[in-house]
């Protein structure tokens, strides 16, 4: 991972090799983006469990969905309206009266880079969000993409859209 500068695809074959060779439980890690992906990784590698990381920023319901899947229950399907509420909750969590609002907005955008991977397939939300300079401007962007024109009822995809990059510095 380090030698590949964290940009190479996950080597699930090597995880499977470690599972076969190890006498202790092995957990799989790497791009566990959805319940379906977690299940696929478990089946493919034979790992004893999976670690879910940054994709839980994009989809904070991921752990709930995994528990529901494991229990054989119907899996919660968040909507774009749920995502809009999540953004409000994030903002409230990050608010700090001591820090300048501009810095707080920048910190929120770090999270939104991940959330935005599943908002629209063309990356329009991410582009507009990244260019917003004031909280009110950001909330207008969020409302446009997540709530207006009936979008609040649309399902929030389980997987990021292909080619939509969370980290602008990694865009080709």
Task: Identify the role of each PLM range.
Residues 6, 13-28, 32-172:
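Alpha/beta catalytic cores of nucleotide-metabolism and tRNA/nucleoside-modifying enzymes
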Residues 2-8:
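Short, small-residue-enriched loops and turns at beta-alpha junctions
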